């Protein structure tokens, strides 16, 4: 029997997955919703691995599929690399990672410089600390495909992450890449990745980098935003 384990992203906890719980129950799918500890990056790593091990211990006869959205996708990848073939499948949704080093030509093409990076970090820190207006944050995460009622409901459960955790997160590229130096869980039959073409927070190139790194199968949903694949009936 398959058992799905769901990891959330930044600024929300397991409430994010409540929208699909009725479908899981309707199809008699076994699942667990995990609240990751975002008090620090180290605690997040520890809680992701510990939670999965505890669920496995509780249900020893099941095949486990880890599903992660956004940053939760990176933690799902981390757990899969740590546990290897004990994991049955890995699915990550709208998750990306930049390589350690980017060639100068690519840097020029992407028009990245120190100033733009600083502005982005400030903007993202304001976003996840709850200092941006709702109309702006919703447009970053959703398209019109997600009903307004669902957007409002999720906004009730948003979490203001600490500045310390956010700064750790924004400066963690080398840490994540170091965890992927040796791949222990990969391949198109084992790893599925899903992306929305209108995602405004995760660059497509960062998503494709993970696809290549994990030799994963993937699907891109045209017109979908960062959250829509989960929150919109259309997908």
Cite the ranges covered by each PLM segment.
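Gly/Ala-rich beta-loop-alpha elbow adjacent to hydrolase catalytic centers
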Residues: 68-72, 76
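Active-site loop/oxyanion-hole signature of alpha/beta-hydrolase fold enzymes
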Residues: 33-64
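Conserved HGGG/HGGXW glycine-rich cap/lid loop of the alpha/beta-hydrolase fold
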Residues: 2-41
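Short beta-strand/loop motif that positions the catalytic acidic residue
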Residues: 187, 193-195
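Conserved alpha/beta-hydrolase "acid-adjacent" motif
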Residues: 200-206
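Conserved alpha/beta-hydrolase catalytic His-Asp/Glu region
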Residues: 127-170
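Catalytic histidine-centered segment of alpha/beta-hydrolase-like enzymes
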Residues: 224-234
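Flexible "cap/lid" loop of the alpha/beta hydrolase fold
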Residues: 90-122, 165, 171-172
